[in-house]
Amino acid sequence: MKNCISRRSFLKAAGILGAAGALAACGGSSSTSTAASSTASSAAASAASTGASIKLWTYPIGGWGNDDTVQNLISSFNAKYPDIKVTVEYLDYTNGDDQVNTAIEGGSAPDLVMEGPERLVANWGAKGVMAPLNDLWTDDAKKDIYASVESACHNDKGDYYEYPLCMTAHCMAVNMTKVKEVGADQYIDTDKHTWSTDGFLKTVDALYKGGYENVAAIYCSGQGGDQGTRAIINNMYGGTFTDAAHTKYTADSAENIKAIQALYDAKGVNFDPSINGGEEITLFRNGTLQMAFCWNIAQQLNADTAAAGQTISGDEIFPMAFPTESGDPKLCGGIWGFGIFDNGDEAKIKAAKTFIEFIAADPSQVKDSVLASTYFPVRTSVGDIYAGNEVMSEYSKFMGYLGDYYQITPGWTTARTEWWNMLQRVGSGEAVETAVKTFVDNANAAAAAEA
């Protein structure tokens, strides 16, 4: 078995930080999950939906996981629609899916949920529990929203189950202070934030030989932050996670097998079944790890435990695209927006659509809604909302590296579980070819069953 960071060591390290800020799509909060609720309401009448009361459940999508931020947005909504009462519950990526699924099974699903197409379209939409949003997708909306985003928000029948608000590119990060210390910055194009696969492996080796035993972790305790482990493996030698038509999973390709084997063989890279993406971020911030595969602009801006862009000891955190042989990285994209659960109440569905239209489409509001997320707009009409912001302008370079949004492939929920199980088996010494075959067989069986 490859070395891993023991759970005791992780907890000891994490104790230094307290509640570390692991944000959207990277494992949620590293502290114990508790759902907080809050309400915004007004006694005035609304022409849109008199007396309607709706529930919004949101994952921690940048500032959309912060109650003060969300309440300010709801206050803006209530200024225009004062009679629609909005109750908010905050989820995380550790227990959020279980909470939603339990609510669905118990007939108490929220009216609105904020997350991405992999949940709203490929999961809950495919299960028939979401209300179609086709009427919100007007011709003007389709012209304004990026085509790559629009295509991810509907199923193969053309039914839309997500109305998007914001997007970003997931990347990785390195402790640049330590990289420079061992002379490995020569392998990094700091202007483009890119490097070759050979340069990446040489950097890992230099850090390991420089005394940093734990350079990076292939975290695999669960699905939290799994976009990072998929991306490092797919990018290294040009592999893909699915076919272009999003009908089957392709992790058993020669390119992917080569990448997994290279990571397994690399000294300093540990397959660790005791941590997820959020916990990897904690270990990166406190200096236990020198690289993080679970990263995006929300992490770069996070200042909960140290100054933004720094580790807890003050080292420079430098965001990077994943390494490639071709020089053309393909980053996983995050798309976030709103979906409506069909609870059989047309008045609530109407009120929920009114909320979506205001927050995600109203020209007077949408900029503030996106800014709250700390991500980027999906609408061309919104323009450059970060003009003059050096950090955001620099990070916008990653948007040009966005790859295929394959998270809407049938069988996605099963594939995510099979993925971290596969990585655990590799870490335990199972042959890579055997492990990926099991993954592909099980994931594709699920895809065929849902097609």
Located regions from the model:
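Hinge/lid segment of periplasmic solute-binding proteins
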Residues: 45-48, 116-171, 198, 314-323, ...
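Short, solvent-exposed loop/beta-turn-alpha elements that line the ligand-binding surface or hinge
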Residues: 132-145, 189-193, 216-219, 239-258, ...
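Extracytoplasmic/periplasmic substrate-recognition and gating elements
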Residues: 52, 75, 79-80, 85, ...
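Conserved C-terminal helix/tail region of periplasmic/extracytoplasmic solute-binding proteins
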Residues: 363-366, 373-383, 399-451
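Extracytoplasmic/periplasmic solute-binding protein
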Residues: 157-165, 170, 196-248, 289
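Short helix-initiation/N-cap motifs at beta->coil->alpha
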Residues: 90-99, 118, 194-199, 273-286
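Glycine-centered hinge/linker elements that transmit conformational signals in sensory
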Residues: 201-208, 245-275
